[in-house]
Amino acid sequence: MPRVAITYCRQCNWLLRSAWMAQELLSTFSDDLSEVALIPSTGGAFRIDFDGEIIWDRKRDGGFPDVKALKQFVRDRIDPGRDLGHLDRTSGEPGTP
């Protein structure tokens, strides 16, 4: 099973942001991920790795990932045919604003 690691800057107080993203991933993919690890760091780091592949780096990608895009990326790696419900709908479809 895949592993996700979220490296965050503890000096920047990004623990809550990284814990929220971990919670979102675990809530959606509880049976599909072996773990979501939180790794404290320094120097403004905020990086998300999926099985050793860097999928988001704050400095490289500019800012923080949208949780919708993060979940869709993980879904596409784990189970591309899986419906994420409202996350897969675009504005104007039934059930969306």
Label each region the model flagged.
Residues 1-97:
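Domain-level signature for proteins that mediate thiol-based redox and metal-cofactor handling
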